[in-house]
Amino acid sequence: MVLGFLVRGGLVAATVYYTQKVGIWGDSDQTDKLYNDIKSELRPHVQKLEKQLPFEVPQLPKTGEMRFLAKHYYNEGVKNTFRFIHMLPCYAGRGLKKVKDTFQDFAQSPAIAGGAESSPPK
């Protein structure tokens, strides 16, 4: 247990150290340079794969577009989280009502179908 914790902690520390070293946590110019370097390194591999695929692969987004998309989806996530928190009492009330109704249905004795069609033959 302790060994597993130490291994996981070491992996997290190594990941943070490596990402700091390559510039992910640096200023925006450093991150832009890293993004463009990765993009240029992947370009030959992507071109080789494009020839083998039966469909066209879209281009990677530009840096400014990537920033916009990251901000947009982050903001959408925050808004949806707060919308869920705002609606939580309503959801909880509906859920509790549904549970109450279900237990009331279970508490009632089953209805016996009467009539000539349901009586056993003699």
Swiss-Prot record:
Q: Which residues form a coiled coil?
A: none
**Could you confirm whether the keyword NAD appears in this record?**
no
Signal peptide region:
none
Keyword DNA repair set for record: no
Topology within the bilayer: Single-pass membrane protein
Q: Which UniProt keywords apply?
A: Membrane, Mitochondrion, Mitochondrion inner membrane, Transmembrane, Transmembrane helix
Where is this protein found? Mitochondrion inner membrane
The transmembrane segments are 9-25
GO cellular component terms? MICOS complex; mitochondrial crista junction
Disulfide partners:
none
Q: Which Pfam families match?
A: QIL1
Function text: Component of the MICOS complex, a large protein complex of the mitochondrial inner membrane that plays crucial roles in the maintenance of crista junctions, inner membrane architecture, and formation of contact sites to the outer membrane.
Subunit note: Component of the mitochondrial contact site and cristae organizing system (MICOS) complex.
**Family indicated by similarity:** Belongs to the MICOS complex subunit Mic13 family.
Q: What is this protein called?
A: MICOS complex subunit MIC13 homolog QIL1
Organism (species): Drosophila melanogaster (Fruit fly)
